[in-house]
């Protein structure tokens, strides 16, 4: 497992995006966190295997019914493991 940091750009705040991502990620068995940033984007940390990245990106693109995702960037995060179980909204 590797920890990845995702930044989601678009209409992703005030539209239940974090709640939808958290619920769908937990259903799929992912561990991570999702958090609003001051610049209007959403930051997501997730522990994934390399072959899970494309499926997780689809989950992030889906978001909530009212959200509109314009772009998602991601990098490998330099951290050992998450401190949380499940998928936590911060």
Stretch-by-stretch model annotation:
Residues 1-90:
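Intrinsically disordered, low-complexity, mixed-charge
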